[in-house]
């Protein structure tokens, strides 16, 4: 039953329920209460004697009967599906006690005898009345009803034998509580009042007309019609299909009501459900409709039955009224109606009276009890209603509990999911935190990059502005140069006209020579006649005089060998002198004629030689073709006639061999003649080259002398003008020329550097270098002289390095010709043409691609003058130990044979400069002695180039240009060596001796004072000036030009980075000293020129490593002992540049130290192992030779000696290895000692500079103190100035402290910044210095800051930045006036503290450089990364190792 449905009192299905219950009781009751009683009597005649007894017995019997059947019927009434029968409840399972399936039984005790209290204790006259109730109810006070759960067990005892019922289906609650009472039954003592009521309700009989009304008021049915129909349908629908067969429904109703199949009601229902008798299945809606219709039909039949019952009752009353005893008739009629037999005995009247009296009394009692029961029933109905409501509430709570349980399960699942999601969220949070940290780091790095980019952007903007200015300057300069070019073109036109005139004169002279030769022939014929006459006259005396004429005749009758003629022509004077001394009576006419003849015998003209050469080659080709044809015809004839003429074959073969041998001898003779032609031509060319070199040297000497004189005059005039001009004008004018020079250098450098690298990559292998190139270059020397003079006039600021390069190159070329092979004439002419056709600005690639024919006839590219630059003796990288090694054969021979020609260093051109930028071309200059005073030549040439500018009325610019050139002169050599190192590693790996030789030669080169404006190309590092005999003079010659321009020193690193620099300010009292230094320098340069001319013919010497080291130490000593009047003198700058170079060099050394150590150890071990294996193999071979030479004692002795020699060789090898390692360690120790010396000197220089600047600061502060006190009272003005102080400080520090990169473009250059003492800045500092709170973070201004790549960003109070401000800066004005002595004492303390800090920092740096742990180099699996390291780092450090280490 659904919880929400409320019971109705008048339910149309009540009749069906009552019928079903009555039928169940009728079947279950064994002793039916409706059995007809059998009255027993003592005799048949007197039936009234036992009536009382029989009635009492019957009442007792029906009262004391146990209620088993009632329990069974109660069990059967629980659900319609329960099977009827007394045993249906015995085997049912027991269910747990739950509020859902709990069923309560309401027990009512009805007693006939005694009071209510007696009935409670007496079981004889009372019988329990039980009905099922599934709703608990509170017990009333009269204790008429007991509520006993249906789930009580069997152990309750025999008196209350209540058995467990069948558990109802969950969700189906049957409320079977039916309260029934019989208030109209006269037999009140019967124990089944409800059964009587139900039978009457079925229409089986009623005694009174008031029964239906009372019955409808008393009975309450709680079963709903629809719920009952649903229950029946669900019971029949066992498979839960939603449809039930009609036969199942009819069988269920038949079985439940125990009716037969012929019952009219079931038959009618079957017809209604299945009219066609096909046993169809119907759904729930159809079932409901038909069943409701059938129930209505049954109700209508029930009304008819009630009417029939009333009619029968009236008839019965009539019959009873006719008889005497209504009771008897009533009893009889009742018994007959139930099918019993009427008693035949005649009862006595007295007994009947007694019975009637008892019955009336009992009836009254029962009526009272019925009234009480009605009241109890009403109370129970109210209670039942309350219980129903409470039950509904409990069911709603149960449903809510179930929902809560489901919700709890869902919540648990959600909690598990939340835990999983929480763990995942924790992981994601950890990942997000890691990502956030990573993003923060990246953000910081990006911020730093953005800041760096902003700084770079500012620098680029500044550079762009500067470049714009430089472009404007260059435009002006270009205009001037164009004017000069036009003037030079006019000069060239004049010179070409002169050359043409000279050519005409030469032609005339040739014609005259021809005429003279004809005259000489005539004279020789006369001479022959005279000789013949003399022989006839004096035959004995004329024999000695015949030698010359005989030689002449032999020369005439010879095979025309040019070599023999040239050999005789080279020593004509000696022969003539010998003849003149030995044959004193020879005539002067003979001597003159013989001299002319010998001169004419020097050979035919080049045109004749070329014609003979061509004719000889054509003849050889023709003979070759003829020989080939004859050979082929002979072979063909032999093959054709081999079958027929076998006998003549041998003869023909011999004849052919003879012919071929003759032809071969002819060819050999012709080839020998060609060799003679070539040799004679080579000698002639060599002679011409030597003559031309001599003439060029004389021209250069004269030009140098003239230029030096003009330069000296111009410098003297400049000195006088400079002394007359005031100081401020000099400062203003000293800013521009350096700037202009810097523009020229920066714009010229990269293009030349590119040309240099391109030439290196395009150069052919070393084996293709031919000796003919040097000879032909000597032929081109006159053309080079003209081009060099022209270029000098165009570019007056060109310095010594270009001239020195081309001269050293040409000299090395001339030297190399003495031990080289010979070449033909045609390739020489082609090479000459390829050089002379090149214009001044011709690119390097064009000159490289000019073809010429080589020795073997193949065509190969005509290389420029740089071919000699690739010689291994000059380009080998520096060995790790810098050992001294002797020069190879080429160097020694060239050095011994060739005279000194350093005066040739002047001339060059742009083309030659581009072609000779390889640094090894400079190394050729090492072949000559450094004692020739070459640095002075460089100074004089620089002065001569200054003179050209001075003539245009620009003395100030010329002076500054000279200073820039001299300062660049000091930093050139190391950069060139770096270029050699970085590029030679790419091309070739050289033997150890050549590598060891490279460094001392390079050190000697730097003594030549090489300088070039192309600082990008050649590097901006200081060179270590070395010398053999006069190293001190060389150092002085380098110092003096730099002292001349020390006021205008600028930072090469700053110029590299396009940072504008301003010359430092010098006091006026030092100007006379500078002028005297300049004058002294000019005088020394003139002396050096004369000394160079005197030493021109001296023999060159090769300086070894020890000499180079000695010169380095002597130079350092001279620098350290130099006068300290200027703290930034050239020696200090050199030391500082050397310090930076060494520091970076040590860093790079440590970068590859461990890798190189392992490689060297591995190579050493491999070499020793190889030597050991060779010795072992030699011993094995000797052991194999011993059995074969046992008989020969001399051989055995030799073998034993060889074995002893092998043992000695092994020992010597071990000794050599150990000694070489010791020597390398000593070399390294020497290098470290020099480095420490340089660093100590650098520290001393820094200390002196700091002391000097600190003294200047103290002096400036004392001068500014009175002015500061005058402003002490204006506090508001101080506040205003202090607000502006930060921006001014930022601007000033930005303008001063310019930090260069860690590896700038010119490492090792000067890192001093010379700042001007601007009056506006000084005034701002003086006015804003009084802030007491802001002074702690402010530095006193310095005129110079020393910042390197390592220390640029350190903001410590060391000497690399500015000294710490004194305590007086922080004191208020009132205290400053009162304690000057105390502040000075504290100042001294601070000075010493700063000095100690600087020394500690430098010592720590030195220790880190010396003891730094080794770091592996870049991966060397492929060559790219190693080459990248070399290209980036080593060109700036001067390091030269053995190239890329082997894998």
UniProtKB/Swiss-Prot annotation:
Q: Could you tell me the membrane topology recorded for this protein?
A: Single-pass type IV membrane protein
Q: Could you tell me which residues belong to the region Disordered?
A: 64-96, 420-439, 790-828, 841-860, 991-1132, 1267-1289, 1355-1379
- The parts of the chain that form a coiled coil are 354-518, 665-731
Tell me the Gene Ontology biological-process terms attached to this UniProt entry: mitotic spindle organization; mRNA transport; positive regulation of chromosome segregation; pronuclear fusion; pronuclear migration
Per the UniProt entry, the disulfide pairs are none
Q: Name one cellular component (GO) term.
A: nuclear membrane
Biased composition regions of type Basic and acidic residues, renumbered to the chain? 800-812, 1037-1049, 1080-1096, 1120-1132
Key words, A-Z = Chromosome, Coiled coil, Cytoplasm, Cytoskeleton, Endoplasmic reticulum, Fertilization, Membrane, Nucleus, Transmembrane, Transmembrane helix
> Is the keyword Endoplasmic reticulum in the record?
yes
Q: Where is this chain's protein located in or outside the cell? A: Endoplasmic reticulum membrane; Nucleus envelope; Cytoplasm, Cytoskeleton, Microtubule organizing center, Centrosome; Cytoplasm, Cytoskeleton, Spindle pole
UniProt region (Necessary for nuclear membrane localization), positions on chain: 1388-1447
This protein's major location comes to endoplasmic reticulum
**Matches recorded under InterPro entries:** KASH5_coiled-coil, KASH5_EF-hand-like_dom, MRVI1
User: Transmembrane residues, as ranges?
Assistant: 1389-1409
Q: What segments bear the compositional bias annotation Polar residues?
A: 71-92, 1021-1035, 1110-1119, 1359-1371
- Renumbered residue ranges of the record's region Necessary for spindle and spindle pole localization: 1076-1265
In Pfam terms, one family for this protein is MRVI1
**Has UniProt tagged this entry with the keyword rRNA-binding?**
no
Which residue spans belong to the Lumenal compartment?
1410-1447
Low complexity composition bias: residue spans: 420-436
For the Cytoplasmic compartment, the record's topological domain ranges are 1-1388
Indicate the disease this protein is implicated in: Defects in irag2 are a cause of pronuclear congression/fusion and chromosomal segregation abnormalities in the zygote named futile cycle (fue), a lethal recessive maternal-effect mutant. Mutant embryos undergo several cycles of anucleate cleavage and die.
What does the sequence similarity comment in the record state about its family? Answer: Belongs to the IRAG2 family.
What does the UniProt function comment say about this protein? Answer: A maternally expressed membrane and cytoskeletal linker protein, which is essential for attachment of the centrosome to the male pronucleus. Promotes male and female pronucleus congression and subsequent fusion after fertilization. Congression is mediated by the sperm aster microtubules.
Q: What's the protein name?
A: Inositol 1,4,5-triphosphate receptor associated 2
What is the gene called? irag2
